[in-house]
């Protein structure tokens, strides 16, 4: 009687790393993701920075300029673009083309697929945020975040919260049209509550309360606090953690190969 030896399970890292590198190559080749996630917020910063109206110190903004206020919002813009437009389109596109179905026969599981997308977009977000902050500082004199620790905690939680929402959209959407529609709608709604069209500080009281509960609004307020030298309010950070848990768990639960 001959003994049979079972194949050892694939090392998780050996599966995830090539998957992340493959996703990163496809993201760069697609061009649309880098253009919208890196090029567009940088272009908006340059446009705003060259308009005198945005560089006037205002008593209504506690002595800050509109450009000072808009840099954290542009940071949120980066995260929202990736989370609501890039992530759902990529994953739903893979599902419709049968890529996910083929991956099902490999050691790759749904958690690794979602993790690879999350990592690629987090790296992209980090690059874009650093570029925005440096250009704002060097070209327009906008101060760098004064509370570095609080800023890092805020940006990481904001990125995770928004990316898990994007993964949830991808997992729950039956096709790319639905994913695009939901993602685009959420993008504009969330950017409104982030203060892109109307600074949060001058919103009516009701809208300010809604903004604090919205993921992007909580993110902008946390980043603004840290930029001004304060530790983000615990409620803002807790709000982001709740979004990570709820939508991250929902994305894994609803994930479909085909």
Question: Model-flagged regions — what are they?
Answer:
Residues 162-175, 252:
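Transmembrane-helix boundary motif in ABC transporter permease subunits
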Residues 102-111:
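Short helix-to-coil transition segments within interhelical loops
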Residues 114-132, 182-193, 197:
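Transmembrane alpha-helical interface segments in multi-pass membrane proteins
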Residues 39, 46-55, 170-213, 217:
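Transmembrane helix segments
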Residues 23, 46, 133-138, 167-168, ...:
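Alpha-helical transmembrane segments of multipass membrane proteins
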Residues 13-16, 20-24, 99, 206-227:
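Hydrophobic alpha-helical segments of integral membrane proteins
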Residues 4-15, 19-97, 111, 117, ...:
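Transmembrane helix-boundary elements of multi-pass transport/secretion proteins
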């Amino acid at each position: 009687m001959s003994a049979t030896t079972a194949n050892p399970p694939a090392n998780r890292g050996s599966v995830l790393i090539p998957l992340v590198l493959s996703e990163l190559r496809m993201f760069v080749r697609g061009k649309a993701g880098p253009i919208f996630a890196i090029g567009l917020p940088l272009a908006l910063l340059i446009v705003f920075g060259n308009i005198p109206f945005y560089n006037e110190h205002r008593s209504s903004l506690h002595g800050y300029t509109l450009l000072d206020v808009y840099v954290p919002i542009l940071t949120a813009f980066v995260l929202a673009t990736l989370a609501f437009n890039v992530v759902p389109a990529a994953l739903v596109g893979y599902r419709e083309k049968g890529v996910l179905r083929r991956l099902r026969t490999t050691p790759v599981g749904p958690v690794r697929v979602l993790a690879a997308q999350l990592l690629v977009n987090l790296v992209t977000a980090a690059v874009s945020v650093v570029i925005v902050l440096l250009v704002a500082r060097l070209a327009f004199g906008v101060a760098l975040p004064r509370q570095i620790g609080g800023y890092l905690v805020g940006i990481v939680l904001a990125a995770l919260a928004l990316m898990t929402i994007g993964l949830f959209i991808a997992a729950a959407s039956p096709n790319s049209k639905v994913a695009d529609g939901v993602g685009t709608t959420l993008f504009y709604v969330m950017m409104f509550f982030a203060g892109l069209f109307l600074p949060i500080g001058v919103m009516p009281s009701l809208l300010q309360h809604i903004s604090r509960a919205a993921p992007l609004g909580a993110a902008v307020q946390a980043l603004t606090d840290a930029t001004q030298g304060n530790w983000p309010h615990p409620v803002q950070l807790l709000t982001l953690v709740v979004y990570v848990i709820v939508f991250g768990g929902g994305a894994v639960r609803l994930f479909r190969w085909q």
